[in-house]
Regions:
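Positively charged n-region of N-terminal signal peptides that target proteins for export
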Residues: 1-4
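A short glycine/serine-rich beta->alpha loop
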Residues: 44-54
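C-terminal motif of bacterial Sec signal peptides marking the signal peptidase cleavage site
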Residues: 14-16
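Short low-complexity stretches enriched in small and charged residues
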Residues: 54-60, 101-106
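Active-site alpha-helical elements of protease catalytic centers
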Residues: 57-70
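Conserved active-site-adjacent core of cysteine acyl-enzyme catalytic domains
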Residues: 18-43, 68-188
Length: 189
């Protein structure tokens, strides 16, 4: 019995028991800062553009590969990288994604709510720019700013005013596409 009492006393001394009145009140926590950009894809997972077998750039597919990796679909991203290439149009890409069993959503009507949803849910989306001749990943969209990941220069994000980006996107066919899987968890605060 003495050993048990001695062990409990020893544990209490080591654990540092305090009375409820002795504990300092919790300091108010700062509001966590949202990760910027919302889709903060590590450099190693960003897919650069490549030349397809038809001699065209593969920006739509490179963007899809990056977004699939962000959403944890690495094998699917590798399959897309190995089996798809060249330029693509919305209906053709939809057909290929359907055949591959990829879950996705897209718009071709310039609906800004789709962009907001894709960024709010941290999925991001591919969007057309330059008159519909190029696709980049929209990785952030807030009240003032948009961030793009261009597969022709994956080293850094391109920040542009929101309204400038939306006007460019709408003038470029208003096509946006994203895979629909769970995105990566946010960085710890």
């Amino acid at each position: 019995m003495r050993r048990i009492v001695l062990a409990v006393l020893l544990l209490a001394m080591v654990a540092g028991c305090e009375w409820p009145g002795d504990v300092a009140p919790l300091a108010p926590k700062k509001r966590p800062v949202a990760e910027r950009p919302a889709v903060n894809l590590p450099l190693a997972l960003r897919q650069s553009n490549w030349w397809g077998t038809g001699g065209q750039g593969s920006c739509t597919w490179a963007t899809m590969v990056s977004l699939l990796r962000w959403q944890g679909r690495y094998r699917m991203a590798d399959w897309v990288r190995q089996n798809c290439g060249d330029g693509e149009w919305p209906d053709d890409m939809a057909q290929r994604l359907d055949e591959a069993g990829v879950r996705y959503a897209y718009v071709t009507n310039g609906d800004v709510k789709f962009l907001e949803w894709a960024c709010r849910t941290r999925r991001g989306c591919g969007i057309t720019i330059r008159g519909g001749q190029h696709m980049v990943a929209l990785v952030h969209l807030d009240e003032k700013w948009a961030a793009l990941l261009d597969d022709n220069a994956v080293e850094q994000y391109i920040w542009v005013p929101r309204e400038t980006l939306i006007a460019e996107w709408k003038a470029s066919d208003g096509w946006a596409v994203t895979p629909i899987y769970a995105p990566a968890a946010p960085l710890p605060q």
